[in-house]
């Protein structure tokens, strides 16, 4: 299987790259790649940059250049549910934009003409949730938008709109949207690395 993995920052890319065998690193245009393998899987690891535009551009480039069988978005996120502790892992069953409003006839977070929420691939979700690890793994909704959320009033606004939201990040919504358009299975796995609750 060929797996595309997308991170936003160099620190995230380096941590994932440590797991790869037969590594080679290179740059194509604005994007940094590490290509390698895990068991019998070919891994294309990309650093796309922070935010939705970088994530969307990187995902398109990854899909068009490498034709991965699936895409995994991974990195750090802010926890917005009190059940989460720092260093817990959140795997998305769904993802939603917390900063999109297209007017009447659309749900908050929905881009007109697209689903209100993007679904994570069920097989990838089940695989992640079944891992035998001492780290706590939570599955649910990730809220994505172009802002690093630290203000309590903004957090409360997100929680009011998306009661079941577990974490916030800045890239997964765009990655999900591109994978939906290109019909590529996608999963989002994030480490809760800072306090927002």
Feature locations, PLM:
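Conserved active-site and cofactor/substrate-binding residues in soluble primary-metabolism enzymes
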Residues: 8-11, 50-57, 66, 84, ...
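Short glycine-rich, acidic/polar surface loops and turns
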Residues: 169-187
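Glycine-rich phosphate-binding loop signature in dinucleotide/nucleotide-binding domains
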Residues: 64-67, 184
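Structural motif
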Residues: 70-72
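Mid-sequence, gly/pro-rich, charge-dense loop/helix-turn segments that line enzyme active sites
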Residues: 80-163, 167
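Single conserved hydrophobic/aromatic residue that forms the stacking wall/gate
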Residues: 190-197
């Amino acid at each position: 299987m060929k797996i595309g993995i997308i991170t936003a920052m160099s620190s995230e890319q380096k941590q994932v790259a440590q797991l790869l065998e037969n590594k080679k690193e290179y740059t194509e245009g604005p994007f940094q790649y590490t290509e390698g393998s895990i068991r019998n899987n070919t891994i294309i690891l990309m650093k796309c940059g922070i935010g939705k535009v970088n994530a969307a551009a990187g995902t398109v480039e990854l899909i068009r250049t490498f034709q991965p069988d699936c895409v995994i978005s991974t990195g750090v996120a802010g926890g917005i549910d009190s059940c989460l502790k720092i260093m817990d892992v959140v795997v998305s069953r769904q993802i939603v934009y917390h900063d999109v409003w297209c007017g009447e006839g659309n749900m908050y977070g929905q881009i007109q003409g697209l689903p209100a929420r993007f679904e994570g691939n069920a097989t990838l979700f089940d695989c992640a949730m079944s891992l035998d690890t001492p780290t706590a793994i939570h599955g649910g909704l990730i809220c994505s938008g172009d802002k690093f959320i630290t203000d309590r009033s903004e957090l409360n606004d997100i929680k009011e709109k998306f009661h079941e939201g577990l974490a916030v990040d800045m890239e997964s919504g765009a990655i999900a949207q591109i994978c939906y358009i290109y019909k590529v299975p996608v999963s989002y796995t994030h480490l809760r690395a800072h306090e927002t609750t």
